[in-house]
Every structure is written in C-alpha cells, then in structure tokens.
Amino acid sequence: MSYQGKKNIPRITSDRLLIKGGRIVNDDQSFYADIYMEDGLIKQIGDNLIVPGGVKTIEANGKMVIPGGIDVHTHFQMPYKGMTTVDDFFQGTKAALAGGTTMIIDHVVPEPESSLTEAYEKWREWADGKSCCDYALHVDITHWNDSVKQEVQSLSKEKGVNSFMVYMAYKDLYQVSNTELYEIFTCLGELGAIAQVHAENGDIIAQEQARMLEMGITGPEGHVLSRPEELEAEAVFRAITVASQTNCPLYVTKVMSKSAADLISQARKKGNVVFGEPITASLGIDGTHYWSKNWAKAAAFVTSPPLSPDPTTPDYINSLLASGDLQLSGSAHCTFSTAQKAIGKDNFTAIPEGTNGVEERMSVIWDKAVATGKMDENQFVAVTSTNAAKIFNLYPRKGRIAVGSDSDLVIWDPDALKIVSAKNHQSVAEYNIFEGMELRGAPLVVICQGKIMLEDGNLHVTQGAGRFIPCSPFSDYVYKRIKARRKMADLHAVPRGMYDGPVFDLTTTPKGGTPAGSTRGSPTRPNPPVRNLHQSGFSLSGTQVDEGVRSASKRIVAPPGGRSNITSLS
C-alpha cells in the first residue's frame, strides 16, 4: 500500500520576514540588498522595500546571506543487521539545520531481493513524520532483474526520484556485475535519471579482507589496509568507462582519495558527464586515526571507501573542489554508537561503517577552502548548495536567492570560531571524528520555509515539518550535453551489396583431424592426431609389440669407436 502521509503532521506557519543590510551571495554574484519573505517564498529583493505591517526584521549588519545548504548524501534512521543508525530523521535534520543545511537528500537502501518501492514508501513514512527540514530521496539498487527495472521506471516517473545508486563493492550483498552495471546505466539514461556509484573493487576487497584476517589483523587498521585507494580508483575508472559507453551521466559518491579525484577531473576534461562528491570526512580529516591505540576511536572512522592515510589528501581534495574538478559536497552522515560498532571488535569486516558530518560540513569547507584562499564565497555557495540543486533538478527553487525561490536562507558569519565537540553537537553519536578541531565560519541565523530555525545559538525546530521535494528527471544541467550527443551518435549500418562469394562450411570434418568448427586448437591449422592409449601396444609385463622395430623417421648414431658396453665405473 502506498504511503499517503500522516494527516496530523505539523506544518510550519511561515513568518513574514525582512532581512536588512545583508550581502546576498549566490554562486555567480554578490551584492547588497534587503530580502522580504512571505508564505515560505522570497517575494522581494532590493533597497527600500515596501512591506506590510507586522513584519519581523532581522538585521544582517553587512554579513553574508547565502542559500541554505543542501546535503546530498545522508543515511538517517538506516536499518543495518537488526540495528538502526542512532540519528533518525528528527535528530539528523536538526543537526543539519544547526550547521546551515536546510535540505537533505537521503539514501533509501532496500534489503537485497526486496522491493525498491516498498523501501521507498518506508523511508517516506519515517521522514515525513520526523524531518525538520525539506528532503528528497535517492534509491539504491541492491539487486537487478526485470522486476527491479520496472520499479526503477515507476519511481522515476511517478515518485519523484531522479537518482539511483549502485554498488561496485560489498560482494555477495549489494555488488552488481559489469553486465548489470551496463544494463542499469542504459536504463537510467533512458529515464533521464542520474547514475550514482559506490566505487570500490569488491572482488579484490573480499580477497584482501581474508588475507588480513589470516595475518591476524582484526582491528580497524585492517579496514583501510584491505581497501587501498587503487581499488577505489579502478572502480571509478570502470564506472566512467561504462557510463561513457551507455551515454549516461555518472555521479561518484564519497570521493575519498587523490587517485579517484584525479580520474574524475581527467574524465571531465575529456568531456565526460561525470560529477564527484567528496564528503565532510574526506575534506576535513585523514585516515591516520585507523591506527589509534583506542579501538573505539579508530572504529569511529571506519567508512567505505576509507579515509586516506595520506595526511595531505584533505587539502588536495579541497583544491579540486575549489577548482571545479569536483562539483559538490555531501556528508555521508551515518552514525552508529560505539556499542554498535563493537560488534566488529574481533573482526574489522563486521564493524558498521559510517561517520558523522551533516552539522560540520559547511564549516569544514569554509575553514579548509575559503579561509585558506582556495575558494571564494561564490564557489562556496556553489559546492554547498547551488550545484546540488542544479544536478538534482531543484534549481532555482533551491540553491539560489531570487524572487520566487524558497525562503531557505542562512546568515553566515565568516569570522565565527567554533571548536567541534561531541559534548555539544546535535548528533546522538558519542564520538565526533572532528573532535577538537577549531573551525572558522558558522551560521548565525538559519531560515527554512520562511521560518527561523536557528537564532542566537538556539534551535527552534518542529518535528515532522519537513516536506518531501520531488526531483524530476532530465535536469538541464546534466542532460543537455547527453541529449546532444545522442543526436550526434545516431548509428547506421554501412550500405553495401550482398556478399556472394564462397563461405567456409563449419560442419566439414577434415581427414584424420577434428571437425573444422571445433574450438580446440588453432582455427587455421588442423590439430595433430592424438594417440589412443587404449589401442597402444605398450605393455607393463615385458616385451613391447613394437620393440626392435626401427622407426623410419629416426637415425641411430653410434659414438666414435663404436658402442660402449660399460656397465660399471669400477
């Protein structure tokens, strides 16, 4: 039965709001102007606005006013082996709002062999009842057959889903074959959807995991040792190749290594329609913590693909994000408690994977990229909000400050300093992988659906107030080039006359040989005759049938001086 939504879900009554004296920052321009909002929409932008009475005025005092962040990758309330991630849609979206994010896109992860549509309806019910901010959904394809293909078509055309993820890892669970990858990409390209991939070589990982365990390596360090970055890079290259062959846009989730990031950059320079999504963790921290003596701390960093042990990787990935080689950012927020992680205390392959990052995402990027001079304020808006809205066909409703856009806004203080700590973050998780980091840049005011959610350090959220935002297919930002290439790549057979020459008969059997059509041996030379040992004259009991018979094809050569009859060296 299709989930229709609870009748009593609270909805936000939008305030009439006026932001005065702010500097509006979009992805392509910055300018000073006032903003008037009503009914959850931006109604006016300019100076000396004429607004109705009873309007609440917020003084921006020259601070930046930016579009609310869009976190394109979360796992809230995700079931896993009888457990559930500790941050549900209420706690997760509350953390998002605290960090300046006003919309999330969560991943629906169906159990293998189960219905994608039923999983989608389950996620909708959970999110509609608990989400504090707007949300959309990706659907992960955890197996593939004709029935799943029909569900994908229905979800795309009728349910507001325009992105589907496939796994190239997790052998014998979610992993798809190369043939299935080709079929899925072909299907998604025809639907105008976006093909997302979790890029790792699952076959080799399975072998490496077994090797590590045989060596007695059972702790979290085994996770990164069994998943070297070459396995991420190989899968990224393979996915790019298949996407190119099927003319399907590709979206690589969780870009964690230099090698993977470089491949995406190179492919884009060659004209491939591919997008790369680094996450809060890969932008803000490295994988040296896997070798911590504190097992719980090391386990908190376990995620796949793993964080790179190379401490220069975060700076490198931030540089590619700033240059446009990578296009947007997610958090991959997927939090388990220490007790839940501890089911893998004796076997690293059993540690539930996932890290926090939804609350820290925007501050990490500001601190690592903008404050260091790699990225300007407009690029910051692009990689935290606008590019996501464009890719998933939400623009300009989301991701832009313009008349008619949703009133999802953030007053951002570039000079604010915040020390990250699990003691005061909004996540339920006991551990924060960014613990102790001092980050520059933070939200002062967060407005979602025209309602103030964060002000003066205090959150004012309403459980269940978030709306599902459907994502329609064929995003112009993604598909304009794809459509043009389809027209150019219209294939035709070469017109030629019928061949009327001789045709080799594959059923003919040459004398003394195997049939000409046999697949054994060389296709151009007949196989030599094989001796039938059952008809051999060889005997184990004495004289052979052919003994003493000189072969016509052999010469017998005696040494100089004749034959020797030496039987002893003494």
UniProtKB/Swiss-Prot annotation:
Keyword Electron transport: no
Comp. bias regions, Polar residues: 506-524, 533-544
InterPro entries: Amidohydro-rel (IPR006680), Hydantoinase/dihydroPyrase (IPR011778), Metal-dep_hydrolase_composite (IPR011059), Metal_Hydrolase (IPR032466), Metallo-dep_Hydrolases_sf (IPR050378)
Single GO BP term: nervous system development
Principal location: cytoplasm
Keyword vocabulary terms for this entry: Cell projection, Cytoplasm, Phosphoprotein
Modified residues (Phosphothreonine): 509, 514, 543
Post-translational events: Phosphorylation on Ser-522 by DYRK2 promotes subsequent phosphorylation on Thr-509, Thr-514 and Ser-518 by GSK3.
Region annotation Disordered: where it falls in the sequence: 506-570
Gene Ontology molecular function: any one: SH3 domain binding
Entry-linked PANTHER family: DIHYDROPYRIMIDINASE-RELATED PROTEIN 3, HYDRANTOINASE/DIHYDROPYRIMIDINASE FAMILY MEMBER
Protein name: Dihydropyrimidinase-related protein 3
Organism: Mus musculus (Mouse)
